[in-house]
A protein has these predicted regions:
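Active-site loop/lid in soluble adenylation, ligation, and acyl-transfer enzymes
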Residues: 7-73, 84-85, 148, 158, ...
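Aromatic/basic-lined ligand-recognition segments
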Residues: 151-158, 162-170
Length: 261
């Protein structure tokens, strides 16, 4: 990792929030709240992982065009939730994936440098699991593709055979950064085709012979260990408290802020 953009600080402690499974609207509210708390100096840097309570399509903050049919989609008789991320990028179908989130500060340089400084722990963590990743290089066609996983930019991570495993998006507020991304572990290919009108990308071949929660925990363990090593930090596990939940749920216009409207 380029030292200019290094996150390493031997005396730094980050908060690790245990795996959380709630609605997409609440996940976006939590990410936004953590960003604002860190920006105002009330909260340390944080790493967390989460899954989605039901299949969800998350739109990029500036994404204004998407099929109207997305608002009536169902999967196994469950409505597909449609939410808006605080970060940019294209639409992501969250179903069978694991999402990571980092909130930190102190990175300088161009946005891509910040992406790659944070993504280093993803590269190292997956390497420890036997998967080599490299960055994508999509051109202008990215802006015309409604699906985040339809192309790969310099902020995305691909497997050795060229298939996108992790799609990331970022929001910078002054010196503070929120970066989160979808790690494609398993997915219903029929639902992907229903959403985007095209075949699902081929699955990334993983050497890990696990599924479901066991797979999630194996990946989380590898990535948390890599984060400690790459960033030179100590991770302190701390779930969200009742008081913090109250603050998150009390955010003004929570439903309007993170809905697709």
């Amino acid at each position: 990792m380029n030292q200019k953009y290094s996150l390493q600080n031997p005396k730094s402690s980050w908060r690790l929030i245990p795996l959380l499974r709630v609605s997409g609207q609440l996940q976006m509210a939590i990410d936004q709240w953590l960003l604002e708390q860190h920006q105002t100096g009330k909260h340390p840097p944080v790493l967390r992982f989460y899954t989605w309570a039901s299949p969800t399509i998350s739109l990029g903050y500036h994404q204004r065009r998407w099929p109207t049919s997305w608002q009536q989609l169902t999967w196994q008789e469950t409505p597909v939730e449609l939410v808006r991320r605080p970060t940019g990028g294209r639409a992501v179908l969250h179903q069978g994936d694991l999402t990571y989130m980092v909130v930190t500060s102190g990175l300088t340089g161009k946005r891509l440098d910040a992406y790659q400084a944070i993504c280093e722990f993803l590269i190292q963590g997956w390497r420890s699991l036997g998967v080599e990743l490299h960055y994508g290089s999509a051109g202008r066609e990215y802006a015309h593709n409604p699906s985040c996983f339809g192309t790969a930019t310099g902020a995305d991570l691909l497997s050795a055979d060229g298939y996108k495993l992790i799609g990331s998006a970022q929001l910078q507020r002054g010196n503070t950064i929120l970066q989160h991304g979808s790690i494609r572990l398993s997915r219903d290919t029929t639902l992907f085709t229903q959403v985007f009108g095209e075949p699902a990308p081929p699955p990334v071949e993983l050497p890990i012979k696990q599924e479901g929660d066991a797979l999630f925990q194996t990946v989380i363990q590898a990535l948390t260990e890599a984060a400690c090593c790459c960033f030179g930090i100590e991770l302190v596990t701390q779930p969200l408290s009742d008081a913090e939940w109250q603050e998150i749920l009390a955010q003004p216009s929570l439903e309007r802020r993170y809905s697709n409207n």
